[in-house]
């Protein structure tokens, strides 16, 4: 299963709210758009489930949390999924996958949403930055970036080699 230009182009639009879409498009056009979103999201879901099945069992990651293609009021401007092992379901840190109009990202993140219900502080999470230099010695840094999440997901991220 491969991501195609159409998967990225799905998000290349100005309007994501159903209220605004209804002002500019017919019901039939909106229904067609919803159907297209659902088709791409089903592919996204299948991709994430396939990734999970391909992971080593000792990681304990059996089911990703896959965000829906809509929240009821808006189409998503990206598709997103979080991965946590069974032992880490109650922790804020997770691996995540993001697909938007610009890129496909795999990243470690601190999930702020409902963070008060899970364990792990921002301070403890940020301590992981201290391990980046040693880890970077084991990989080719090309293609790795730092995303502080304070910047928008579409802003170019800082290359890891520049950060180090």
Predicted regions and their residues:
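Short, structured coil/loop segments at alpha-helix boundaries
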Residues: 5, 26-30, 37, 117-121, ...
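N-terminal targeting/trafficking signals and adjacent low-complexity tails
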Residues: 2-12
